[in-house]
């Protein structure tokens, strides 16, 4: 059964438990045939990026998980098909033995999710904790998320969420066919106070329409 990752930005509070769990699972641990140990520094197979919008005093902070997308049509597989493969469950794996010396795989990933291990001279990335999945367990990053912002499971199980989801890089979604789906990604942030000058009071529930003078894009929001 094909697996997918679901990340909901609205549920993420930036605790970075997933980021630490990945380090805990992979630093100094060898999980062959899927992965050699991850270095202490220089690599984050799962990381949380901050997205800051607005300006003081109206600021909105959101978080986005940056990770391997486990694409069905993975660019890295095209560059080194003998060293990168997709499992039946959809997880994309870089074979640590066959990929030795193939630094070109780092640049092949448009999501910047592949890292170079200078000591071992191999490219490395998220394996989806394939060794845990094989044992019927969840990837460590998913297991430690306290708010279920990051989930993992059968594609059919998340059909409703997938229908509403976005891609990390929308412009590459059709080409790469990523198996990591994003919900509630940060959008345009409009902030301010609307006042009725006649009543001299703040309006609540007023519908606002704004237009970008450069792009002519129109946005609507409610106070």
Give the ranges of each region predicted by the language model.
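Conserved aromatic beta-strand anchor motif in extracellular beta-sandwich/beta-rich domains
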Residues: 210-212
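Short, acidic Ser/Thr/Gly-rich low-complexity loop/linker segments typical of extracellular
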Residues: 204, 214-223
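Hydrophobic alpha-helical membrane-insertion signals
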Residues: 15-21, 25-26, 30
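Mid-length scaffold segments of soluble, non-membrane domains
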Residues: 86-93
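Structural motif
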Residues: 193-203
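Exposed beta-strand and adjacent loop surfaces of beta-rich binding modules
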Residues: 189, 205-207
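Flanking helices and flexible, charged tails adjoining ferredoxin-like Fe-S electron-transfer domains
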Residues: 30-67, 72, 78, 93-193
